[in-house]
Amino acid sequence: MKISDVVAFMGHQVHVCRYREAGTLLAWMGRDLHGKRVLDVAGGDGYWAGQAGRRGADAVSIDLARGKMVYGRTLAHAPALIECDALRLPFGDGSFDAILSVCAIEHFDDGGKSLDEMARVLKPGGEIFMSADVLSRADTWPKLRDAHKAKYHVQHTYTHDSLRKLMDERGLDLVRHSYQFRTAATERLYLSLSTYGGKVGFNAAAPLTPLVALADRKAPNERGSIVLVQARKR
């Protein structure tokens, strides 16, 4: 295993939220993806698209961060990496069986336009697996909220209901959803790690992942810091 693979594993998998977040989306997608063409929208270095590729998918990752993609090409399971805008995807209609997007839509000025493009390139019956910032209690801690939004360029936040409406308008039916960091304590943890720790903080807090997961299982699936959704194109 190359050093770049070790660094990518540590950055993506040893992480208090990404491990569960992207791992859940991939679990929903399925273990056997042979014969499937999968697009990761705003996939950075393509690590998670690469994990879909390991399951047999013909995986493609798009992003505008050239440096991340240059790094991604050094990974052992690198997908096809294409530099392009998520709001203007360079693919024909119905090109993909599944679309993955991990906490990307909140960074777009026009989240609806990004969903337009995802729906366009998705085959009928194909599915979207995505997550988004919710920050349902963020107004309780305005300094943490504002710092998080400024640090990560969060333009909008979404709930499963607001995503359901946007998706329905684009011919997509919500199949299921799941909130993460559902309790007040874990939501504050999420914002505090974001504000004061950044990526290093999220990585260092990885040992807390089982405790956050346990708290989530005991709380209603109604609110949280992040929402995961699966939707199917009509």
Model-inferred region functions:
Residues 1-88, 100, 115, 224-227:
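Conserved N-terminal segment of class I S-adenosyl-L-methionine
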Residues 108-113, 139-140:
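Short N-terminal helix/helix-N-cap motif within the alpha/beta-hydrolase-1
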Residues 112-127:
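A short glycine-rich, Lys/Arg-flanked "PGG" loop and its adjoining helix->strand segment in the class I
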Residues 133-154:
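Short, glycine-/aromatic-enriched active-site segment of Class I SAM-dependent methyltransferases
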Residues 143, 176-234:
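A C-terminal cap/extension of S-adenosyl-L-methionine-dependent methyltransferases
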Residues 155-171, 177:
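Short alpha-helix
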